[in-house]
Amino acid sequence: MIQLYGLRKDYRVGDHDLPVLKGITLNIEAGEYVALMGSSGSGKTTLMNLLGSLDHPTDGDYHLAGIDVSSLTPLELAAFRSQHIGFVFQNFNLLPRATALDNVMLPTIYASDGRSRRECIEDATKLLESVGLGGRLDHMPNQLSGGERQRIAIARALMNRPKLLLADEPTGNLDTVTEQEILALFRQLNQEHGITLVVVTHDAEVAHEADRVVRMKDGLVAEDVRQRASTVDRSRLANSRAEPLREPASAWSLPATWNAIVVAVLALRRNALRTVLTMLGVIIGVASVISTMELSAGASTAIEETVASMGASMLTISPGKASSTSGRQRPIQIIPDDVVAVAEQCSAVKVAAPLVYSQVQLVRQNRRWSPNLALGTTSQYLAARNWDQLELGTPFTQEQVLDAAKVCILGKTVAHELFDSEYPIGEEIRVNGVPLRVVGVLTEKGGDVIGNDQDDIIIGPWTTFKLRVNSSTGATAQFSTFADQMPPMQLASTRRSTQREEIHQIYVEAESPDHVELARQQITQVLSRRHNVEPAGAYRINDITEVSKVVGQVVGGVSALGLVIAGVSLMVGGVGIMNIMLVSVTERTREIGLRMAVGANRSAILRQFLIEATVLCVVGGFIGIFAGHMWSVLVGRVIGWPTAMSIWAPIVAVTVAATVGIVFGYYPARTASRLNPIDALRYE
């Protein structure tokens, strides 16, 4: 079964090659029970490692059941170990966080023999029962005695039905009674199952149990003694014939990947505090991404809602200073006749209304309130702002505008501050000392682009605010670009002409958002012609889309800055993950060697550690999503900034976190996958 021809193994020590095996030629028949003996440094352990394909010979040939092991590639060697070799180690090499059943099932992860998980569980259970541990399936290694742990190691070695069982000092850490039990188990496996057994030992009693003893000295076979003829039934050796190496199981198959995820979670739980601290950078980075995206999405939504509430087709015309056709500089005034001209002569204009602003204090009984905005206008303005359908009452009429009637309409906020839950219609309030009757309450609008309350407003006829409210205090408008107020006028009980009164702005609604630019051009031409001025600088015409663009650019800039900071945090988190994964590779070097010994190839090891890094980042990502959402809600409430949840935010965050795990976990995973199995098993 085993043929060794001139097998050599040299180790490089400094500038020199140190020969350990100096040309071993040895044949071992199928079903033989062989003991390898020799003093320390004789080469017996090195020979066992070569037999188990854990190490590569420097020279010579090694055939097992007709397979030229010396010529196999690393991938084929992994499949060879999985299919043909079983290992029993002196120190057991059990996974500390896995149950007895899971430890025995470890080789099946890397096997490609077609067994289902249920079949693997059944086989592992039978093996544990056969070694006397049927009642210990769910026990952890630290809950078992040394003999029980070695029995688990033997059951694990038999899990893939190997042709060759290699045992390195299997009784070295056991008491005398347990040693005899293990030796009896070896004899049973050899005689009843026909397994070829090679045991490395210093103990003469252990060697006495073998059919054949091979003594080594100075890297050569010094003595080869057959103690007794093999008693194995030759009919049981039929299955020991060579089988073609099966295609290795895919490292990324669903069962293998799921097992890797489970192992990753167990490994991360092993050092919970270190895991949390490692994830902190990812958590902060993802939380920054989520909060930034939600706050910016909320701001964008607020901008859109404000544009919709104020009108995407809205323009405001304010006076400026310009040169007349004669070349003289003079201030420009806007009068109600200009409003009429704009409405009648500009085909792109749907609605035009005058605007008069005031700074006022409102008083009702013992309640006082200063609204954000006190505005005089006409009913056309209310219609353009979708305020013609009031929550309570009715809009003021054109007749009331002409009469400068003492009426007003309150926003929801003002109505609440002055009347609380009382019915306000028909009640009287004082506006800068002028008594006005409440005729309506506006429907709720909410905050504007920058968070100002659009419902903190009082609206009345522009004539009322111009001739009564503003004149009552001698106040001037709050806008420096407006002309000085005209002297207060004696109000008459009859209607009077107000078409030459100065107003502060003109509110215009274009026929559609597409007509805004045309409306701007037409308005400039009409007003410049009416006032005999050059168009440049005479009027400032603004539309809400310009304001929205500016605010949007500011929000975009702040969001970009936040995302840059989040990216830096993710980079720091990624470096931390790389560091901790390198530490994990070092701590689990023996585990890596064990997995390779039972059939794991480089791709499987790479997958294992890559998944661990990814799991670390994805878990941190989910925590970051929750933390980021809570942070954005908190910030929004504290500073009054709107927030909006986005389905893309968590998707982007998890994707970025997983990418960080893959990118920064690749180097540690690659480092683990390139370890030499024998070096990994020897690592202390």
Swiss-Prot record:
It holds the Pfam family ABC_tran. One of its GO terms (cellular component) is plasma membrane. The keyword NAD does not apply. It is an enzyme of class 7 (translocase). Homodimer. The chain crosses the membrane at residues 248-268, 275-295, 563-583, 615-635, 644-664. Keywords: Antibiotic resistance, ATP-binding, Cell inner membrane, Cell membrane, Membrane, Nucleotide-binding, Translocase, Transmembrane, Transmembrane helix, Transport. InterPro entries: AAA+_ATPase, ABC3_permease_C, ABC_transporter-like_ATP-bd, ABC_transporter-like_CS, MacB-like_ATP-bd, MacB_PCD, Macrolide_Exporter_MacB, P-loop_NTPase. It is found in: Cell inner membrane. CDD domains: ABC_MJ0796_LolCDE_FtsE. It is a multi-pass membrane protein. Residues 2-243 form the ABC transporter domain. It comes from the Bacteria. ATP binds at residues 38-45. The keyword Transport applies. One of its GO terms (molecular function) is transmembrane transporter activity. Its main location: membrane. This is Macrolide export ATP-binding/permease protein MacB. The gene is macB. Non-canonical ABC transporter that contains transmembrane domains (TMD), which form a pore in the inner membrane, and an ATP-binding domain (NBD), which is responsible for energy generation. Confers resistance against macrolides.
